[in-house]
């Protein structure tokens, strides 16, 4: 068995275009995994192996790659930076122990960086920071460090300083050994020399080294006291303190360089080994109750002596077949073992196991706690399922994914391709939990739901290229919701008599608005036996089932509380089905009286605008019913944060490029549901009626 202290499971994440795929490429070249480095702008990079990724120059799926550095095994996940694929980042963070946050030296802390950083904080993932692209025009390492402090409220621990900047960038000062690392112009990462620090940088290097040591020794009281008494700590003591502070998220070791020019990557790799945690040094995964989802108090201890426990964190269908990516938390998995899927209750025999290198693979006969690998040909497994030893059934903490906010209706251009389309869409749904499909019961249309326009564009593209299914795509539809604003006290009786035994159920109830995000809540305060307890579940089921279709436009209903306080029953004619029908009738009767209201999804929008165009951009956001939350001037322009209804954001990127002469950028993610203005609600209701009439 491998020594777990020599394992590092890390993710590389950042804003789109910050250079994380290029950084991964350089790491793979340095660790001997690839011989010729692919360039993203040539569509050749190793981890961007889907056609859509190679074409668009953005990473969509998190490719898992295993490589080695200084006798340590690194499992690297290269995550997407585009906001529509945030679910991939979240999914990856769930199975990682550490990460490298890549920031652009000129762009700084960009919108998606914030989202990824927030997710990483929530997941408790220790990170190093790599400020990339210091060879770029407008690059400023110190400005980016300041942004990390201000925008992310994080504590960057500067470990290297740039020597030169933009075209003059040639190397870094390593503050640990107080030496300069200078690369030549051949572009080869191994062609560098270690020399004395340039004279004009000695003072700054001493200043930053002092800050580094002062911050590090705060992790050890004895060392801090000795340092305050004038005793310089040893290099090993400094590293030990940095390691502890990094693992505790007290600070983030921060490096600089240029991945494209092959400068500075070695020191980042050393930091992964020296400062990021091994699988045994992170909090073990909690086990949860299968029924309630609540923690049981037990954990999956990272050890090869424990029973086998693993999490399926990604499903992929590629040219080799169906792949299930798993992270093993405890125990050992051998080829031929039988394992239990605790979510389905079914067992499966492990056929082939492979170690992935982007889309190439190495066959394995066994794997152990700490490993990230892919199993070939598993059936009935979905993202978030727990795989375990059949004799020691358990459930790991599940993954929770955001609900889609946008949908499109699709149908195959070839009328005979319906079955082919259904199979292909089924595979995509298994791969991506934030992508959903449903069939419109009235029209029979297939509805695809996703996290944004680009998300759905790419799915349609994959269906065409990978599965040969060309689709006719309808206009994007917003996922509106409905709710109520007034309390109602009411009564409903369901009575049916048509020979033989009849049906009878009477309910007296109160309906009122619930708390935001509370969903549907049912309570009973019936005193005595007017409604026997055995009928309560049927009444709850009747009300809950009606929450799927609201009274105004047929959208799902949010945040409603129902209290059953009295009723009546018949000894012969009352039954569960009679009370369920009564609850459905009660819902239809009372909802129009309860002040029903249309809710619309509001997006958190982050726009970058050149200074010259800020007024136009803000004016445009206001016209889109946007609420400006914040503005921040940077070196290259202004960032504007706003809440804007999703319905106003379709096609926004084209409009933004027009008013900023192609220089504007934006990202958005779902924020909350909010009541529509009456004129918008009226339009939504009219459109819903028109769709219904057309079916």
Swiss-Prot record:
Subcellular location: Cytoplasm
PROSITE patterns linked: G_TR_1, G_TR_2
Short name of one Pfam family: EFG_IV
GO biological process terms held by the UniProt record: ribosome disassembly
Binding positions for GTP per the UniProt entry: 14-21, 78-82, 132-135
GO function terms (MF aspect): GTP binding; GTPase activity; guanosine tetraphosphate binding; translation elongation factor activity
Keyword field: Cytoplasm, Elongation factor, GTP-binding, Nucleotide-binding, Protein biosynthesis
GO cellular component terms, semicolon-separated: cytoplasm
Function: Catalyzes the GTP-dependent ribosomal translocation step during translation elongation. During this step, the ribosome changes from the pre-translocational (PRE) to the post-translocational (POST) state as the newly formed A-site-bound peptidyl-tRNA and P-site-bound deacylated tRNA move to the P and E sites, respectively. Catalyzes the coordinated movement of the two tRNA molecules, the mRNA and conformational changes in the ribosome.
UniProt-listed PANTHER family: ELONGATION FACTOR G 1, TRANSLATION ELONGATION FACTOR G-RELATED
Name under which the protein is recorded: Elongation factor G
Species this chain originates from: Alteromonas mediterranea (strain DSM 17117 / CIP 110805 / LMG 28347 / Deep ecotype)
Lineage: Bacteria, Pseudomonadati, Pseudomonadota, Gammaproteobacteria, Alteromonadales
